[in-house]
Structures are given as structure tokens and as C-alpha cells.
Amino acid sequence: MKLTILDDVASTNEIVKNALREGKAEGLVVRARRQSGGYGRQGRIWDSPVGGLYMSLLLRPDVAGSGLSTLSLVVGLAVQRALEALAVPAARDAIQLKWPNDIVYMPADCPRADEYRKLCGISMEACGGGVCVGIGINVFPPEIAQPVEGRNIPQYMADLMLSG
């Protein structure tokens, strides 16, 4: 595995997709402190201020294109389990995979199923004989609050973790 940590990039996905096109080996991970052009599924904007975890992974799985939906599920479940392990016990059951590409926080007392808060977005892009797996996790709130559009109200992992 090769980890590259960058300060500020347009998109970690674009860096990994370029590496895929160049024939780079599986295992490259690109992480950025901030992204100016982060995006999710169907080109939706992923706000990426300092305080989150934004990374992309280069994979070359030995599966047919139809197997990518299974890969998406496996990645989603792995991220969900990792976030649950970091959360206080009372918050763990509320961290859920929202198919096909989100990890959300939906406590039992949530009045409606569509009133969840978004913890993480995951994207899968086939490119250059491989797959770019993009993961964006809301860890800490930004220093300057950002306006929230649509239903993607963020939930920050720091609020669900033990302090100290």
C-alpha cells in the first residue's frame, strides 16, 4: 500500500483515476485535508472543508463489472463497522448503511426515516481497468458553518465519539 497525504486538492478521486489510467498498481491511497472539487455519486457536490477525512483508494479487483455493486456493499459495510467501533456504545446502532453509497446517523427516536444525518459518502468509479473508491467522512465540523442544501444534513463523527 502507498499512502499519499496532500493538503488541498480538487479531488482525490481524480488523482486516483489518473493513476488508474497510467496503469499504477493496486493499493494507492490518496488522502487530502481539503478538497475544492469533491464529488459523490452522479456528480453531486461533496463539501470537503478541513476537518473531514477525504480519501480515494485504487483497486484492481478480479471481478466482472456486474460485481462492482457487491464491492460497493462490502466497502459500505466495512466503513460502517469502522465508524461503529469508534462511536460511543449508545450511538452505534444508529450508524447505518443507506444503500447504495451513504453511511447515515439515524437514532431510534428519529421521527421519520428520511430525517437522517449524513456521516459518510462513498463513491465507486470504474476507470482504466480498475476501480476508484472514494470515501468522505464528516469528522469535525468546519470552523465556519456552511449552508446545508437538500437533505444531506451532516453528522460529525467527533460528536459520536468518547472524548478525552
What are the functions of these language-model segments?
Residues 1-88, 109-114:
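N-terminal lobe of the biotin/lipoate ligase/transferase fold
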